Structures are given as structure tokens and as C-alpha cells.
């Protein structure tokens, strides 16, 4: 599936448009999800295939925006047991592919619902490999993500 097709799929679900902007004015465009808002933090990446809920609640990611490199994040949903702490530490989350419906008997919420409940601003539909290379080369730069529906790109 090419980028144009992927964006058409995400747009048909009417998520607000979103962007990631770095201090050096480099912009990545995506589709917003999770809590509608704007947040700023150090942008890092995580290459794990699983444990996205634990990663978002891990204190070592305090005040960071996490770029998840694995393309299928969210397919097992979320629950109340898979947390690293009682508090959500991450400021934002970035995903490659549209979040799918959960397929796990333990799922209580979709990842999108859980992000909204915990006020985590998210983006999907970004080229996370390109973003990871940028982060690797720049050393976890400061960035801002916004998925307010008022943004027109």
C-alpha cells in the first residue's frame, strides 16, 4: 500500500489532521488520533514489537514523544494490567499504520480510546522509518505534535 492509499484509508475515518514539527522547522505530516491537542517533548524511538502500553507508562519515557517503529501497534488493545506504573509518563505517541481493532480477550479499550482517556496526543500515518533515521542522526531532537482538527495542511 502506498502513502496516498494509506492516507485515504485514515482520512475516511475522519481523524483530525496532525503534524510533527521540529525546532529546525522540519515537518512530518500525519493523521491525528488519541487526545486532541498539542504537546512538546524530546522525540525518541522505540523498536519493540509489543508492550506499547507498558512503554507509554514507563517513567524512563517521561516528557518524551515516542515514535514506535513497529508498524502494527494497537492490535491487542489495552487493559488495566499491562502498565509499568500508575501514571502515564509519555507526552505523545507516533505510529506508522492506522490502529486496528483489538484482537485479544484481555482488551478493555482500543489503543485510540486509551490514548484519549490518558490525554496522550498521537499521530499515525507517518513514515516512522524515515523519522527514526532523522532522530538517530539528530540525537533525540525536541519536537511538537498537534492533532487539533483546526489544522489544515
Where is each model-derived feature located?
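Conserved small/polar residues in nucleotide/adenosyl-binding loops
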Residues: 151-153
Amino acid at each position: 500500500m502506498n502513502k496516498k492509499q494509506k492516507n485515504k484509508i485514515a482520512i475516511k475515518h475522519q481523524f483530525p489532521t496532525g503534524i510533527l514539527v521540529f525546532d529546525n522547522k522540519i515537518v512530518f505530516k500525519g493523521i491525528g488520533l488519541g487526545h486532541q491537542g498539542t504537546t512538546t517533548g524530546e522525540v525518541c524511538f522505540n523498536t519493540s514489537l509489543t508492550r506499547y502500553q507498558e512503554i507509554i507508562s514507563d517513567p524512563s519515557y517521561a516528557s518524551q514523544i515516542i515514535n514506535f517503529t513497529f508498524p502494527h501497534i494497537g492490535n491487542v488493545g489495552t487493559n488495566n494490567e499491562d502498565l509499568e506504573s500508575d501514571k502515564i509518563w509519555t507526552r505523545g505517541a507516533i505510529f506508522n499504520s492506522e490502529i486496528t481493532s483489538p484482537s485479544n480477550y484481555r482488551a478493555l479499550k482500543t489503543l485510540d480510546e486509551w490514548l484519549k482517556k490518558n490525554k496522550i496526543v498521537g499521530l499515525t500515518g507517518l513514515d516512522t522509518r524515515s523519522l527514526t533515521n532523522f532522530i538517530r542522526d539528530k540525537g533525540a531532537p525536541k519536537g511538537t505534535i498537534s492533532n487539533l482538527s483546526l489544522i489544515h495542511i
